[in-house]
Amino acid sequence: MSSPLPAPSAEALAHSGRLQAHIRDQVRAAGGAIPFSRYMELALYAPGLGYYSAGARKFGAEGDFVTAPELGPVFAECVASDVFAQLGGRFDFIELGGGSGAFAEAALRFLHARDALPAHYRILEPSADLRERQMERLREALPPAVFNRVGWLDGPPERGWRGFLFANEVIDA
């Protein structure tokens, strides 16, 4: 059966081979087995090799897939509007896996225009490459006072917080 998908380039095949070798090395170093969670961590985030860490564009028309935030601001505006309606004044917004930063940009612009910004907007992003892209996008797109509310997390908050946890497409990954 033939596939309608394009064949990977020689460069893509070589990259895939390097990632496979890295994962094999990790399995060997662990005595022959690793948990599935570790396998997924390596496949997605191994520095310079993982799907989200190798520098290739993943989102939008030139990427591998398109999510609602990449199509325009409406989705983020609807979510932000509802979050503000439910939580009112001071709250924290935590986004898991911020992708290109499109959702954060649209949500923060929308809330800023209504004088309804969260106390903090945090993005939990394991990919250093995506983190850098998000920072660049948001720094350029948002007024400094809005950008200064944005921060990046290395893990879930360890203390209690009042706010909203948003995870678009995370379960799919």
State each model region's role:
Residues 2-96, 100-161:
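Rossmann-like AdoMet
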Residues 156-173:
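A short SAM/SAH-binding and catalytic strip from SAM-dependent methyltransferases
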